[in-house]
Amino acid sequence: STGSTGKQIRALGFKCIDISKITKTKEMFSGRVKTLNHHLYSSLLYKRDNKEHKKQFLKLNIPDIDIVVVNLYPFEEYYNNNTNKNLLEMIDIGGPSLIRAASKNYKYITAIVKIEDYKKLIQNLEKNNGKTDIMFRKKMAYKVYNHTSKYDKIISKWLNEK
């Protein structure tokens, strides 16, 4: 995890891995580059039932990622409040990329983008012995693409206003 997301996950009593342990790098450019890394995306995008993918993945010596939880930068909130904050810095790049990659691979990975789904995630994990079921993962993938679509639409609207 990065930043506040990890704190929220730990507050719920769950463990999470600091993103730098997977990326094997530190944040760069004042936090603009945190998660854009081939190690991380390898864990998110490889097909776990594909022997060649698995072989390539094992050579990377990084953990499987089963759950991705991302809270996107609050661009809409700052936009709606006419804040003086530089809105360009509130455009999340890594977050949408992470959840979209995880959702593309929903057969194996759960992506969570809404805080109100944290409890649903916990319930699904408890119901399925520490795993999530395919229907839950697919529903969460739908939410990801719906959420990122709205997020991009607001950014596009703002850019068109200038």
Predicted regions: what they are:
Residues 4-75:
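Glycine-rich nucleotide/cofactor/substrate-binding loop typically near the N-terminus or early
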Residues 62-162:
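Internal alpha/beta core interface subdomains
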